[in-house]
Amino acid sequence: MDDASTLIDVKEYPGTEVQKNRVLTLEEWREKWVDGKIGFHQEQGHQLLKKHLDTFLKGENVLRVFFPLCGKAVEMKWFADRGHCVVGVEISELGIREFFIEQNLSYSEEPIMEIPGAKVFKSSSGNISLYCCNLFDLPRVNIGKFDRIWDRGALVAVNPGDRKCYTDIMLSLTRKGFRYLLAVLSYDPTKHPGPPFYVPDAEIKNLFGSTCNIHCLEKVDVFEERHKSWGIDYIVEKLYLLTEK
């Protein structure tokens, strides 16, 4: 694993299993949206993505970009406005509808025949498609392959016991020459049960190391007042670029 030079020294807990059996149900995630408990949403978009956008896109045009557990991420419109094709998956129909409304985008919706009860929401422009379903059901649908994956708030939200299955799905969606940008969080997992869950460097290497080159682009202190209620006194965000070996 190639590591970025940084002044931030992050304590790692590679052997901890304190969050190993932690499980959040899909209904609990839906309830977070209904109750407005979406502190993970960033209205101004992700600053590290903005900073490293050129590294991510590599000057290429008309890319297919995948957003796992997309919520109402404003970055989806950024990419669509630049001519890229955006596909996302999100369990909360409310989150998807709020995205289209807040971005002032007209859209249509239709059932996903392969997944009972699931829907796909498509922008009228045709370059944003958001699937409202369980991410782990997504392999039943042929959504094609992707040039780029922007994984922020996804791996850290997946129940720890499901990470291997999640990673297998993500890598199955990649095209040759893909670039996968991954944001994870480091904090003391003995003090906060998650989500967002703690993902140590060793776990990233274990999940992606056999198929991907792993490069840490940056580490930033993202501690805010609201994090005090989690019982932690530091939280660091790490941005990784994963590329094909």
From Swiss-Prot:
Substrate binds at F40. The keyword NADP does not apply. Its main location: cytoplasm. One of its GO terms (cellular component) is cytoplasm. Belongs to the class I-like SAM-binding methyltransferase superfamily. TPMT family. HAMAP family: Thiopur_methtran. This is Thiopurine S-methyltransferase. It comes from Panthera pardus.
